[in-house]
């Protein structure tokens, strides 16, 4: 039986997930309970993220702007991590869903899980095992045929 949560936070690493997966993410996470926080993180001035606007508006997802402070260094992961911790301390959620295929979210996932929060990871096949294993539930995207 799938657990249902009253306050679920959905944090999306938009720089690390394909836009065509967004609707599927919303459907899959909604099955776990009521999503009260929906945020997508990225540098929205990048050409690769220009097409996200309509989908974010359609699903009511807040776009969190994060510029890269140094060339070739992604600051988005740090912004998402800070928000995950900030929301934890505000008691804003009882389950956290992180959408990314990046292992950089392993430490924050460990931390929030140690504080009694149910952690759901959503990513692609390439997601490192460390992140998959720390999640209470990891949802794998299906490859398009």
Predicted regions located by residue number:
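Acidic, divalent-metal-coordinating active-site segment for phosphoryl/phosphodiester hydrolysis
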Residues: 103-110
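Conserved alpha/beta core segments of nucleic-acid transaction machinery
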Residues: 144-145
